[in-house]
Amino acid sequence: MILETDSLPEPTNLRELMDYRVFESPCQPFLFSEVDGREYAYGGFSNAVHAAGQLLVSHGVRKGDVVSLLMPNSAEYIIAYFACWILGALAGPVNSLLKEHEIAFVVNNSEAKAMLVHSEFEHRIHAIRSHLPNLKSIIRFDDEKDATRRFRTIEESDGYPIQPRAEPPPLIPIGSDDDAIIIYTSGTTGKPKGCLLTHGNVVANARQISNWLSFTEEDRLLTIMPLFHMNAVSVTTMSALYAGGSTVISPKFSTSQFWRLISDYQVTSFGSVATMLSILLNTYPDGVPEGLQTGQLRFAMCGSAPVPAEIIKRFEETFNCPVVEGYGLSESTCRSTFNPPDERRRPGSCGLPIGNEMKVVDDNDHDVPDGELGEIVLRGENILKGYFKSPEATETAFRNGWFHTGDVGYRDKDGFFYIVDRKSDMIIRGGENIYPREIDEVLYQHPAVAAAATIGVPDDLYGEEVAAFIVLKDGSKVSEEELISYCTERVADYKCPKSIRIVAEIPKGATGKILKRELARIYATE
């Protein structure tokens, strides 16, 4: 579906995409807030965005500036994204699970000029305020029932209206190649890297997902993945907007409320990771609770890490809901492949390219035959412009005109792709990316640790769990529990090892490279 009428051309940036929907269907519902029951039609949403944009302008935000967003899932999170975009500013979502020093790194590295922060997290910003020299303005978002007083500066007592009609901010020229989002993902050095995604990237991925899954204005998606990840932004928000549909914003995944939400809001699809499917199966082994209406549910969309075939089979049989697997990464805005939402689905496969190009190459960047393993490479409208302030990382990732994902997989004779391993050793725990070296460096800071190595190990609930191996310094004594507690104080909880084993030595190859497969074998056999 290409969004063209006699009056408006195909949108090339996110402001045009929003304006298109307001022009076409101003009274059509767009956002439903589960936490307080509020609704935004497209017209009301646009008004709220313009008012929030005016607030940012009043605090000196201009085109090209970065605005950090530290908020829980809410309708206001989407409003904040668009308030940045209509000004030509970059939205900088911050993972709320990070520790304070991790937040400071992301905010400082992105050179953010302003921040929108929920009152729930305000104390965390106060704790590191002196370490955020570039941040000129902090604007707080409160959960007040009066929608006219939700955004305010921390220093002020008066709120700023976001619901009533407001004069639009100055109309800034925005091109499809202008930056829209800087989102941080772990890099090969263990330090997070800022992915620069353009307006064209985000619009393209919304179009690709919406068209592939045949979304229409009748579709109502459920956003339960965190909005600081591109999964929630692209898969269940922007694709809904592109199709003229709607999305229900839930603060977080709740096992007890999940099927009620599907029924009450008549949700037709939702985004998920394998962990969520497993939890739902364990909680509702007999299927959807009686009295709830889920017949309108078309399918579940699942990504981040491969889903075990047995989980897919059980989920589809138990809940009569197909699971459509896909593959992508922050660097591809979100999705690069999806299984077809029909009988062609292949459990275990991540599907077919949905609008970008994708192939498998060897270490010399030569194409490999179907069925042979190699590195997955991508190119297309949804691929990032580059890494912020990281020209070397950008040059390494883009070779011969293709983005190198670091993921190992293969393509079958029918064009379906399969992800087998991650070349980069990245751990994906419940949809969260974890780079082992970061954990290693924390462990090395402990006075009793001589050597450390972290790996991902299979886990029925989270897909992967974090396990570490350490060698003690001569004469040192420390328990595994003490080491885990040490890590808990220094990294986000989801990154913390759940198992730390003390070993005599870390297995290494002839070149000194740690043999992580040997560590995995040791973990599995002990």
Task: Tell where the protein language model's regions lie, with residue ranges.
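N-lobe entry segment of adenylate-forming
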Residues: 1-40, 44-59, 63, 87, ...
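Conserved AMP-binding/adenylate-forming core of the ANL superfamily
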Residues: 27-74, 78-82, 99-104, 155-158, ...
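Structural core segment of the AMP-binding/adenylate-forming
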Residues: 58-59, 86-158, 474-476
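AMP-binding/adenylate-forming catalytic core of the ANL superfamily
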Residues: 98, 104, 115-117, 270, ...
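Conserved AMP-binding/adenylation subdomain of ANL enzymes
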Residues: 203-220, 228-269, 282-288
